[in-house]
Amino acid sequence: MQSAAAAFGLVRPCPARPPLQLGPGSSSCRPILLHARPLAAGIASSSRGPAAVAARSLGRLLLLPPPPPISPDRAGRGRARHVACGAAAGDAKAEEEESGLAKTLQLGALFGLWYLFNIYFNIYNKQVLKVFPYPINITTVQFAVGTVVALFMWITGILRRPKISGAQLFAILPLAVVHTMGNLFTNMSLGKVAVSFTHTIKAMEPFFSVLLSAIFLGELPTVWVILSLLPIVGGVALASLTEASFNWAGFWSAMASNVTFQSRNVLSKKLMVKKEESLDNINLFSIITVMSFFLLAPVAFLTEGIKITPTVLQSAGLNVKQVLTRSLLAALCFHAYQQVSYMILARVSPVTHSVGNCVKRVVVIVTSVLFFRTPVSPINSLGTAIALAGVFLYSQLKRLKPKPKAA
């Protein structure tokens, strides 16, 4: 019996004392001992064999204190974490909305700059060409200023200096040639006719784009695209018939500008100029600008001569400071609006860019009419409106792809 008692020494009755408090609202170990003692003692007195082993195990199990209840502090921390997670998700959503709003505002600012630079370029350019009828000199100055800006951006690191091979330069050369001719023909037209009329004729760019793509690339347009060209051609014809400043030199110069600019787009697809990582659209435009300057400068020297000098301007009775300042501003706006155009193209789809370009043409036409007080008849306005509506329709239909034929 003593050995049995020794085996259950763990369940000897404790001296009478207050139960041990584990915490607020918790139980003590004393009630468990009072219930465990009679049960264990009864088992021990009945047998010394396997029952004794079971009794010892039972005694150990019954002596374990109950698990402490969840502290109110822990529960509060859990609720706090849940609230914090919800708040973090709400903050992330708010930051995403703010980021989207910031991008929208940035894009709107770029469109505004694109239109503003274009307006000032056309105004200053027309003012200079009106009194200084040497478009090759003016175009050369514009390319020269663009070259200086491009070199400055490369040297200062504003624009990453491109790594370009001789083969790439050779492939870009045809693009530079047609780019040079396109801007030269535009300036020739602006010197002969009103700004509004030049831009009305240039609304026919989609017509030449479809024509040249079909001839050289084999890209046949859909019926809807062809139908959208009808109001463009009809509107330009109607505006030309009623244009007060119409002359054939200005008309054909603007048409030649359309052909050369759209040839540039076709050539870029035909030659498939491969761009390295450092040769983005702005770098490509900068390289073309530099090449255009070196292409046109000898032509200006051999044809018109170097006319844009203080001596020549003064002998012609012109305000030297005014002509040179406006020429410089026109050149800066010329380079700036084209760079901003490429920045917009990197952020939006080509269709959105095309629609923006159509709106830009409307803004330039209206602004030039108001600034220069160009006489415009109702029929002339109607023709311009029809042509621009056709351009907008063309840009919308161009994104529609024909459904594949079922096998």
Curated annotation (Swiss-Prot):
Known function:
Phosphoenolpyruvate/phosphate translocator that transports phosphoenolpyruvate (PEP) and dihydroxyacetone phosphate.
Recorded hits in InterPro entries, A to Z, give: Sugar_P_trans_dom, Tpt_PEP_transl, TPT_transporter
Q: Name one GO cellular component term.
A: Golgi apparatus
State what protein this is by name: Phosphoenolpyruvate/phosphate translocator 2, chloroplastic
Provide a GO biological process annotation.
phosphoenolpyruvate transport
Q: What is the lineage of its organism?
A: Eukaryota, Viridiplantae, Streptophyta, Embryophyta, Tracheophyta
Look up the transit peptide and give its residue range: 1-51
Q: Would you say which domain of life the source belongs to?
A: Eukaryota
Similarity remark: Belongs to the TPT transporter family. PPT (TC 2.A.7.9) subfamily.
